[in-house]
Amino acid sequence: MKNRLPHLIAMLLACLMLLSSVSILAGCVKEDAPATETASGQNGAAGETSTEYVPDIAKKNYNTTFNVVAIGFNQDLLILDEDKKRDGNSLDEAVYERGVLVKEQLGVECKFADAGDWISYSGKIANTVQIGDDAYQLVLTHVYQGVTDLVTSNSLMNFTDLPSVNLDAPYWNRNLMESLKVDDRYLLGYSDFCLSSTHCVVFNKDMLQNYRLEDPYALVNNKKWTVDKLFSLASAVSEDNGDGKWTVDDYYGISGWGWVPLITFITSCDMKIVDRDEDTGRYYVAYEDNTEKMLSLIDKVTTMYKANYSYMWPSVNYTALKFAEGHSLFQLYSTTGLISLATEKIRFGVLPYPKFDEKQENYRSLNWNGLMGVPASVNKAGNPQMVGEVLELLGYYTGTVKTAYYELQLGAKVSEAQEDADMLDIIWKSLVSDIGLVCCNSSGSMDNLVYMLPMICESPKKNFSSFMRSNKDSAQKGLDKVFKQ
């Protein structure tokens, strides 16, 4: 489609926000705590949350603060002071009210704490743990920067050592946490409070109708939404404006940043960057678990990347095609951008990334959000009971935040756009993590393997075999060092 030169890999600040499903955790009740007032409140209403599960946490007054380090997260979606709350903004109201409910229930005020930037924060956390300083109660990490440092420096405590935490509660993503266990410990957590971030596929409803193409919502619901189907529908749109050049002024079936969003195709097609051996527990580079399938996916994506029906801009020095201007049927899109897209005039729909084929059972979306960690100093010098209870309530009272967030993403009330909201539900419920992405900075070779698919698309001289020869062994050594295996 267009001539492209190889580009140097640019480490991505996945400073994203977003969401997931919602509610929070059950915990232990102290014997001397009032038994009549729990997290459900005196009226039994769970802070207007939609879940039926209610954490059994007694009302008390710790009279303290809960200090949160947030790296790579949109802070306004986590904690919002009253003076920053915009009147009439339902999302601001929900975030603010969540903090009020936690304070009323536990006498704990949630505040942000400074631990440096995304490069230095892990070192500062490790230092507070080493000296036994209970300065921070929660760290929300970058998607991968600093995560392995926190693990290898023994700076995080096991979530199951927090007395109040019940990982079986609906607001914890236990499946994701299981995939990230280290030595059978849950050092990295994930709950609805994190407001997940991933990539999705948006489509132009008017363009779809004008070209009389299949309804993608029906394809998703009927489990027929596959890579081949996406690219087949996209191939129906390829219109040059007459100047003989393929630019943002022409019309395409599919568009997007030809870098980070391409990585999610590996996950959506039910393959992993790094997996764990069920027998030995050893983490290993997993690209060769199904070489034939991987080669097939690479061929499909690179063919799309070069086709005249696609406009995929490169990793750097690019001109992006703005989806809202109506020049693309589909676009690979970050869920963080849906709120701003909903303010545009374009009529759009939202889809999960496609499956590899119809035989694949589930849709899968790669988590591009950071993770939760509780500094080990909490166990040594702090109050694990209080920390666990706060984490419970923060997740539980995210119900109204989720509803407001959905409506901002859709540009309409959920009740008025149920079909679109159902797609968002599918996306959030399909969220998975990959230890390869989390360990991206464990070595330069692991970084290369994480970005393998977009790098192959950008450079015709690169291929799967050469990538594995050049990076597999070194990446494995990095994993072995991180997990001491």
Which residue ranges define each predicted feature?
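Short, solvent-exposed loop/beta-turn-alpha elements that line the ligand-binding surface or hinge
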Residues: 160-171, 219-222, 271-294, 356-364
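Glycine-centered hinge/linker elements that transmit conformational signals in sensory
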Residues: 231-234, 268-314
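C-terminal capping/gating helix-and-loop segments adjacent to ligand/active sites or protein-protein/ligand interfaces
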Residues: 404-410, 421-485
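Extracytoplasmic/periplasmic substrate-recognition and gating elements
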Residues: 342-412
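Conserved N-terminal structural module of periplasmic/extracytoplasmic solute-binding proteins
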Residues: 2-153, 401, 457-485
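Paired acidic/hydrophobic, glycine-rich loop segments that form the ligand-binding mouth/hinge
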Residues: 136-140, 328-333
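Extracytoplasmic/periplasmic solute-binding protein
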Residues: 69, 133-139, 143, 181-194, ...
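A structural signal for short loop-to-beta-strand junctions that line the ligand-binding cleft
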Residues: 126-130, 134-145, 155-158, 164-209, ...
